[in-house]
UniProtKB/Swiss-Prot annotation:
Protein's name in the database: Uncharacterized protein MG279
GO CC terms in record: plasma membrane
InterPro entries on file: MG279/MG280 (IPR030940)
Subcellular locations according to the entry: Cell membrane
Length: 218
């Protein structure tokens, strides 16, 4: 039973290895075969992201070119400065209430919230566009060169030939093992070494207690 489980485990390991290497080789084959469509998809996605990033930059610029936004931003700045003054002045309770009323009016006008100010919105948009620019710089620009297509071709060839080579080496080694050796009582020995074959026979026979006792017993 244990011997059967060992054989089954070895078979499963070999099968998983072959399937894994076959998957790698297949992925390399399809990547090489369809490198043109893949490159086109990459180019389309790269251009879309770049286009969206440009639109976000335009929105960020247009936000502060709007007169209403400029005015609200200035009012917001004045509110923040006014609150700093009232915090250090115990006689400015009346001014503080006026600031609260003004802030309440701004909330009604444009859903104004001091925690989501226009300057913070612009900074957030700028951070997003800067991050996207940095990411785009790390990837090949398909509008300027064919680096991505070249990388795809090289990697796909490496994957394909590596997978095929390892699988081929495995089957060739297995064929040579079967061709030049044979099993004797469960032990694989060389077909071209009679002395070793004889030794293997003797060792296997002497492992049997009955044979050992018959040969060396009193």
């Amino acid at each position: 039973m244990i011997r059967l489980l060992k054989k089954l485990a070895v078979f499963l390991i070999i099968l998983v290895g072959i399937l894994l290497l076959g998957g790698i080789a297949t992925a390399g084959y399809f990547a090489f075969t369809y490198r043109e469509p893949i490159n086109n998809y990459y180019k389309e996605g790269y251009n879309k992201i770049s286009e969206y990033n440009t639109e976000i930059k335009k929105i960020s610029q247009n936000i502060f070119q709007n007169n209403l936004v400029k005015t609200l931003s200035e009012v917001e700045k004045s509110l923040n400065e006014g609150r700093k003054l009232t915090q250090n002045n115990s006689f400015a309770s009346g001014l503080d209430s006026s600031l609260n009323a003004l802030e309440g009016s701004l909330k009604k006008i444009n859903n104004f919230d001091s925690n989501a100010a226009f300057t913070q919105i612009k900074h957030t948009l700028n951070n997003i566009t800067s991050f996207v620019d940095q990411m785009l710089e790390k990837f090949p620009n398909p509008n300027q060169n064919d680096d991505f297509k070249r990388y795809l071709t090289e990697v796909s060839q490496i994957l394909f030939y590596t997978g095929i080579s390892i699988i081929g080496a495995f089957f060739v080694s297995g064929f040579l093992l079967i061709l030049f050796t044979k099993k004797v009582y469960g032990v694989r020995v060389s077909r071209f070494n009679p002395q070793r074959l004889l030794k293997k026979h003797l060792v296997l026979l002497l492992r049997d207690e009955e044979v050992y006792d018959a040969v060396f017993g009193n």
